[in-house]
């Protein structure tokens, strides 16, 4: 299995590598690399360890780099003699993916794309991926058995790009009906995904029933303890079955039976009952729809804790935890209940240490695995909960939200944080590490480094690692290149969380990407060090004669440049708005003209990047078997990266720095706002903000419905295009 990974990713020369699987022993996965007589030999305790050991060594000598953006492979004909030490990962499990990834990135993936991703996982030492595809096939069979008609099911499943939130109980029937062909295709796809993961010895995390039921089921069972939950982010309410109701265990057991019969028996089953929802505490569940989930960073409503005694709350939570565990255990006694720990950090108003302990206390320590995913956003949750009350847990970072793609990460933080974690005597049953991004295809250096750390790389110099990384990625390195990357690391790769993504209840990675508002004077702009990023860009451009033939050098240059330039556009937007608001029409016109010119250049520059609007829509339409389905998938795909849905704050949450989005979505929206501002400046009047917002909402919905075709337009000379763009955005 490991050899197959290496052949697919590194080419035919990988056939000469000698791979030897050996017993693991009592510890965690390990590998060891040696070379003699010109041949590379890798021994390891698992297929994943073999693949990762080979890749890690080849990257360290500059022979291979495999990333989402592309690969550079130059395996030598013969290897210098070498004998490495045995490398043992400090983590029993290396986890990967987020339930949201299946909406923000993978809804349109076919087997060829999934095969590449599973290969990437193996190369990076990952052995516990979340495997969420294909579950709607089982849910459909389950609800049919429990009497829900096909007509009602058609008004239950949400569109492909929104499926994760329907599965987690946040929404229901959004962008319904879901084509049956999509359900059938995902069933066949999951068969292949799980077969490959299991062949590699991975331990996929599979879905389980967490309590959410179709509205039609709730209406058909008025005597059941089914609670109407709160409306999440402006969507209509959903329905949750109390685990104390006898129906809960029947449904939960039957789901796992059907799932195992369909896809094979698993060990790890994910059930998140309260993803950005609060547990009903009142005996009759009447508080369920009144509670407001609170995320202070997102500026949403604060939690209103139920007016009940702590003892009643803790008893209720303990009952929930026990029932959720038992529903899985009865179906599969060997199973481990997996849950995300995001809720414990995101809503600390409700999830006090006492509440967390109550929820977990009735579950055997070895039968629950908590994915503590948000330590780059909500640090220290595990400490507040006494390491999750002695349960098994995996430490990790989300990093990416919504698949949005500003350039950021905090490499030194990941190194220092994991070093401190492993040295902490209070970590109890820490068993793993993982990256849990909501979306992929951005900042690949972050994930490359995270999984290096997962195999014990905390003691190595970050600068030395970056030197090896860039040599493998571009073909060679130099002091000048290392100096440029030192600046890049300080300027943008020392940013742990992208704070501008939420600003005054508006989502969007940059100001340009947010729905326009007239009061933007206090927008603080990009974190990090933009002047130092600009210096790094000059250094990279100076290296163009030496590196311009390296595709991944050109890719990275464009990525860093568009990030810097978009931040400059944000500042120019503020200048234009300020000028119009003070009545200086000429200055406003000049500032917005600079914005328009820069955005058009940005749109052209990013046309050669991996993912753009035309590729996203093309992948969506490629899933269709009929013209009607193609149009449906296209609308679904466009909605997610723009309006999202509901009447809350989710618009632009999945904003993208893509060709097509710059020129055809973000710029026209701001043009509407600037027209209103300019007219008010000319007339001496004021802008009706409410009317402007309504006009923008109508324009956004029209854009989603519009069938304008998009095609890829890559720049003929990316280096020259970067030079022109920087000259444009830095002009005064």
Language model regions located:
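Acidic/histidine-rich, surface-exposed loop or edge segments in extracytoplasmic proteins
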Residues: 35-36, 98-102, 173-174, 552-556, ...
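Soluble non-cytosolic domains of exported or imported proteins
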Residues: 44-48, 52, 108-112, 180, ...
């Amino acid at each position: 299995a490991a050899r197959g990974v290496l052949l697919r990713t590194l080419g035919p020369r990988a056939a000469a590598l000698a791979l030897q699987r050996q017993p693991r022993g009592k510890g965690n996965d390990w590998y060891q690399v040696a070379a003699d007589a010109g041949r590379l030999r890798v021994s390891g305790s698992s297929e994943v360890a073999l693949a990762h050991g080979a890749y890690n060594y080849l990257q360290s000598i500059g022979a291979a780099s495999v990333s989402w953006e592309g690969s550079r492979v130059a395996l030598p004909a013969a290897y210098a003699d070498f004998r490495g030490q045995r490398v043992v990962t400090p983590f029993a499990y290396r986890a990967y993916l987020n339930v949201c990834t299946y909406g923000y990135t993978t809804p349109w993936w076919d087997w060829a794309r999934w095969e590449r991703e599973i290969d990437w996982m193996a190369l990076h030492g990952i052995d516990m991926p979340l495997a969420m595809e294909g579950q709607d096939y089982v849910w459909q069979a389950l609800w049919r058995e429990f009497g829900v008609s096909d007509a009602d099911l058609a008004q239950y499943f949400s569109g492909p790009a929104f499926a994760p939130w329907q599965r987690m109980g946040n929404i229901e029937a959004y962008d319904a009906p879901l084509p049956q062909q999509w359900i059938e295709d995902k069933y066949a796809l999951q068969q292949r995904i799980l077969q490959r993961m299991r062949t590699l010895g991975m331990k996929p995390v599979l879905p389980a029933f967490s309590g959410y039921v179709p509205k039609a089921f709730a209406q058909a069972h008025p005597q059941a303890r089914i609670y109407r939950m709160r409306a999440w982010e402006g969507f209509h309410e959903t329905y949750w079955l109390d685990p104390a109701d006898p129906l809960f265990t029947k449904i939960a057991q039957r789901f796992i039976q059907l799932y195992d019969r369909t896809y094979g028996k698993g060990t790890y089953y994910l059930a998140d009952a309260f993803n950005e929802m609060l547990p009903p505490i009142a005996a009759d569940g009447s508080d369920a729809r009144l509670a407001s989930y609170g995320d202070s960073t997102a500026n949403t409503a604060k939690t209103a804790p139920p007016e009940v005694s702590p003892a009643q709350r803790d008893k209720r939570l303990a009952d929930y935890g026990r029932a959720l565990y038992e529903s899985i255990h009865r179906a599969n006694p060997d199973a481990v209940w997996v849950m995300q720990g995001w809720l414990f950090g995101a809503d600390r108003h409700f999830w006090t240490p006492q509440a967390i302990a109550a929820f977990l206390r009735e579950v055997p320590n070895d039968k629950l695995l908590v994915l503590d995913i948000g330590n780059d956003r909500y640090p220290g949750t595990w400490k507040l909960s006494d390491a999750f009350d002695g349960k098994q847990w995996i430490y990790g970072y989300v990093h990416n939200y919504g698949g949005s793609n500003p350039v950021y990460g905090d490499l030194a933080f990941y190194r220092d944080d994991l070093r401190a974690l492993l040295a902490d005597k209070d970590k109890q049953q820490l068993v793993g590490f993982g990256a849990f991004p909501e979306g992929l295809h951005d900042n690949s250096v972050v994930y490359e480094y995270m999984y290096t750390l997962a195999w014990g790389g905390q003691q190595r110099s970050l600068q030395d690692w970056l030197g090896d990384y860039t040599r493998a990625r571009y073909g060679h390195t130099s002091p000048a290149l290392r100096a440029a990357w030192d600046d890049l690391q300080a300027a943008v790769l020392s940013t742990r969380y992208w704070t501008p993504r939420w600003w005054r209840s508006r989502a969007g990675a940059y100001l340009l990407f947010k729905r326009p508002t007239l009061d933007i004077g206090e927008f603080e702009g990009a974190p990090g060090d933009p002047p130092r990023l600009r210096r790094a860009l000059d250094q990279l451009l100076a290296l163009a004669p030496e590196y311009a033939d390296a595709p991944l050098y050109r890719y990275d240059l464009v990525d860093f440049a568009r990030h810097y330039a978009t931040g400059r556009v944000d500042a120019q937007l503020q200048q234009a708005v300020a000028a119009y608001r003070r009545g200086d029409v000429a200055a406003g016109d000049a500032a917005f003209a600079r914005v328009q010119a820069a955005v058009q250049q940005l749109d052209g520059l990013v046309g050669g990047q991996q993912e753009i609007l035309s590729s996203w829509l093309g992948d969506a339409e490629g899933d269709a078997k009929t013209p009607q389905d193609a149009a449906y998938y296209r609308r679904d795909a466009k909605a997610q990266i723009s309006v999202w849905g509901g009447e809350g704050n989710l618009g632009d949450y999945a904003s993208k720095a893509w060709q097509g989005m710059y020129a055809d979505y973000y710029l026209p929206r701001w043009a509407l706002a600037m027209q209103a501002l300019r007219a008010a400046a000319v007339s001496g009047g004021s802008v009706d903000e409410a009317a402007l917002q309504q006009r923008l909402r109508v324009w956004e919905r029209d854009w989603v419905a519009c069938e304008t075709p998009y095609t890829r337009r890559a720049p003929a000379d990316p280096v020259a295009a970067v030079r022109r763009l920087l000259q444009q955005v830095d002009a005064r």
